């Protein structure tokens, strides 16, 4: 039985095929089926995803489907010029792709596509022999050049003679012209003047008034032209055969290249699918856990992500709830994602998703239409279930939709429980949907099973499509009836007809749903608080950036003034030295006076500074000419280490003065100093836009704390976030280098950045 079809596997493959470059990739995708060892395919997909994130699309020049051309080569046919051009472009593309992968750091891609064979000699020969429009070039062979040269010379001679003939025989011609038909030059002679010239009549006009005549003097020339044309055709055929034989002599290499490009195109399509659907590569694991799994056949704007986890000590889920509530989509997604992962496909879900390998995936998917189904429908489902039960074992994943429906509810429930028990005894992992109460009760009491339900909003009388784990689903019949206005007396009468056990179960389920609703409300409140916190954090970071820019501008001004003063003194010293070497005594005296004056000014400055209060650790100070207030950390050898909050500077004591009280207070109101600092940040879940200010602040903090290396955790996923982070780092001049982490550092889920300190 083709269980994959019931899980929508072929439909998803059709979606992926739309992203392939050619039929080669599309055919390869059709060959992908679940296997117990999908590691090779998954690792290649993951590496190509990372390639896209870092380098963009790989070079894909001319990677078209040349299967028909290869078959013609195998059959012994000589390829036509346009076919040889297609093969040449394809093989040139193979060479470009191989060289590109050789210089990248992706070992699996490099190893796999290193087997592409180079056909450089063939490509060069085709480029030499065939023009881009498909015409055979004169360069193809010396003989072809000779033939064409002779043809041109002969054509020139014939044209000259034809022009002379028209001029000298104008009286017998219907028109002053000649035509070229079937490889011969003919003249339109008046029928009445037919015998005025010796020659062969080839055509007669429809009116009979004109004959198209080949004069005897042109017959030999035309024959020579026809002979040259035949020689040209034979020479071209020889050249095409020679080029085709190069391919025939390396047929195995050619076929291997086609197979490898088919595989590459298939990988390319899967990666494009992953990027379009925000997918990720899920490797085989020992558990089943879906994190925001999105069924690819449901439109993006309507799909509700599925979150589901089967603990290691459990072997199955019993999912209950009203029809059309999403039960079927949930269990199909588990089976579909398992089959896709085992076939080497990325999955539209978030990181953290885990799936097991099952050598057997079996499913019976029903139609969520009505509780009342025909006997024939029940029989067809039971036929599939019989086959599943017969083949199930500990290597099996079994998906059963609406088990027990289509017959008497009591018998159907008993049959469903018995089938579930048998599958569990055989060691199978099961995902079952039902609306039968006895099956819910059975699941609640079985140590290997978990109940789950599809959330239902009684206010809107509609499902939310969210999975509630640990809570069996109710029918909501009474709630719906009451909401729609049915008399309460009738509803109470209906309730009274339920057994005590049924009423207790209904009450328990209702109580659990109420608790879940309260928890969901708390979750929403926490989410709201988190959003408010993020807004405050963004505002704080923006304020911090403004403050830092302001401080840096102040220091830039002070440094410029200091540099100007140094340049002025240096210039005066240079002038003094020059005067000493070349000037007169008067000029030297003047230069000495200038230097003496500068010396006195500096000495006076030191005296004034010395009279001020001594600067010591703990003092609040300002730089000379500046407004930024900092705190002295230590004083050593006439130099103070001053903490300005956002950075620390070593400043000569002579360049500092104590701050006034009001300046201290202002400083304490705006100064910033991180209380603690970690050398890593986690930006998983953020968009590139959200991550940019966080990454830039992280670089600020690294530099302020004198740390040269940091770690940015962005996860693997589609690679969009990693690509965005690398673009941010590439533009930041403070960054010395960056790279993906080693396996021990987190691999491609982490970027290691080094900054200037």
From Swiss-Prot:
Listed EC numbers: 3.1.-.-, 3.6.4.-
SUPFAM superfamilies named among the record's database cross-references: DNA repair protein MutS, domain III, P-loop containing nucleoside triphosphate hydrolases, SMR domain-like
Keyword ATP-binding among record annotations: yes
Amino-acid positions noted as binding ATP in the UniProt annotation, renumbered to this chain: 321-328
Pfam families tied to this protein: MSSS, MutS_V, Smr
SMART domains: MUTSac, MUTSd, SMR
Coiled coil: none
Molecular function via GO: ATP binding; ATP hydrolysis activity; ATP-dependent DNA damage sensor activity; endonuclease activity; mismatched DNA binding; ribosomal large subunit binding; rRNA binding
Protein family according to the UniProt entry: Belongs to the DNA mismatch repair MutS family. MutS2 subfamily.
Protein name: Endonuclease MutS2
Organism: Thermotoga sp. (strain RQ2)
């Amino acid at each position: 039985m083709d269980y994959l079809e019931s899980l929508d596997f072929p439909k998803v493959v059709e979606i992926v095929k739309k992203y392939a470059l050619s039929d080669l990739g599309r055919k390869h995708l059709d060959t992908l089926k679940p296997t117990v060892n999908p590691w090779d395919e998954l690792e290649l997909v993951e590496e190509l995803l990372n390639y896209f994130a870092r380098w963009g699309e790989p070079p894909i020049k001319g990677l078209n489907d040349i299967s028909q051309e290869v078959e013609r080569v195998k059959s012994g046919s000589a390829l036509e010029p346009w076919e040889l051009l297609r093969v040449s472009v394809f093989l040139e593309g193979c060479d470009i792709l191989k060289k590109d992968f050789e210089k990248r750091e992706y070992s699996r891609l490099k190893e796999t596509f290193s087997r592409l064979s180079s056909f450089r000699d063939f490509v060069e020969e085709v480029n030499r022999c065939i023009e881009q429009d498909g015409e055979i070039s004169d360069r193809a062979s010396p003989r072809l050049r000779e033939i064409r040269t002779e043809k041109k010379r002969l054509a020139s001679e014939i044209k000259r003679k034809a022009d002379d003939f028209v001029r000298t025989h104008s009286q017998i011609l219907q028109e002053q012209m000649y035509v070229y038909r079937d490889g011969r030059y003919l003249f339109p002679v008046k029928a009445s003047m037919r015998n005025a010239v010796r020659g062969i009549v080839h055509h007669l006009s429809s009116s009979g008034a004109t004959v198209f005549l080949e004069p005897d003097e042109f017959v030999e020339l035309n024959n020579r032209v026809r002979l040259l044309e035949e020689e040209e055709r034979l020479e071209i055929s020889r050249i095409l055969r020679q080029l085709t034989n190069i391919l025939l002599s390396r047929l195995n290499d050619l076929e291997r290249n086609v197979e490898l490009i088919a595989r590459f195109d298939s990988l390319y399509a899967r990666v494009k699918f992953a990027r379009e659907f925000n997918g990720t590569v899920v490797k085989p694991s020992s558990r089943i856990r879906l994190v925001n799994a999105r069924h690819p056949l449901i439109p993006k704007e309507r799909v509700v992500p599925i979150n589901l986890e089967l603990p290691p000590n459990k072997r199955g889920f019993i999912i209950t709830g009203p029809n059309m509530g999403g039960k079927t989509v949930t269990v199909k997604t588990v089976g579909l994602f398992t089959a896709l992962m085992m076939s080497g496909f990325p999955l539209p879900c978030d990181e953290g998703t885990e799936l097991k390998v099952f050598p057997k995936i079996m499913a019976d998917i029903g139609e969520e239409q009505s509780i009342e189904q025909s006997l024939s429908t029940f029989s067809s489902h039971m036929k599939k279930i019989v086959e599943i039960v017969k083949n199930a074992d500990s290597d099996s994943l079994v998906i059963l939709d609406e088990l027990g429906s289509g017959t008497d509810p009591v018998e159907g429930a008993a049959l469903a429980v018995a089938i579930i028990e048998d599958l569990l005894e055989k060691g199978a992992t099961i995902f079952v949907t039902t609306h039968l109460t006895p099956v819910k009760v059975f699941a609640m009491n079985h140590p290997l099973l978990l109940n789950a339900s599809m959330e239902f909003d009684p206010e809107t009388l509609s499902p939310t499509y969210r999975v509630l784990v640990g809570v069996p689903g109710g029918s909501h019949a009474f709630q719906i009836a009451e909401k729609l206005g049915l008399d309460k007396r009738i509803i109470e009468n209906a309730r009274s007809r339920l057994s005590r056990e049924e009423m207790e179960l209904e009450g328990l389920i209702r109580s659990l749903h109420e608790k879940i609703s309260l928890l969901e409300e708390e979750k929403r409140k926490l989410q709201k608080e988190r959003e408010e916190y993020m807004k405050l954090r963004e505002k704080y970071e923006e304020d911090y950036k403004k403050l830092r820019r302001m401080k840096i501008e102040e220091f830039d001004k002070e440094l410029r003034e200091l540099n100007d003063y140094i340049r002025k003194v240096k210039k005066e010293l240079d002038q003094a030295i020059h005067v000493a070497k070349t000037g007169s005594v008067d000029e030297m005296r003047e230069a000495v006076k200038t230097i003496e004056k500068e010396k006195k000014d500096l000495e006076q400055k030191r005296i004034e500074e010395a009279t001020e209060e001594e600067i010591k650790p703990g003092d609040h100070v300002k730089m000379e000419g500046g407004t930024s207030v900092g705190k002295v950390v230590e004083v050593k050898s006439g130099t103070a280490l001053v903490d300005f909050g956002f950075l620390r500077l070593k400043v000569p004591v002579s360049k500092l003065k104590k701050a006034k009280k009001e300046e201290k207070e202002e400083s304490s109101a705006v100064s910033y100093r991180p209380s603690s600092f970690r050398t890593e940040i986690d930006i998983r879940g953020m968009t590139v836009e959200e991550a940019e200010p966080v990454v830039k602040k992280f670089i600020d903090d690294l530099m302020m704390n004198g740390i040269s290396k940091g770690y940015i955790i962005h996860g693997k996923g589609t690679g969009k976030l990693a690509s965005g982070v690398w673009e941010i780092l590439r533009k930041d001049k403070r960054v010395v280098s960056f790279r993906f982490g080693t396996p021990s550092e987190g691999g491609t889920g982490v970027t290691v950045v080094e900054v200037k300190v």
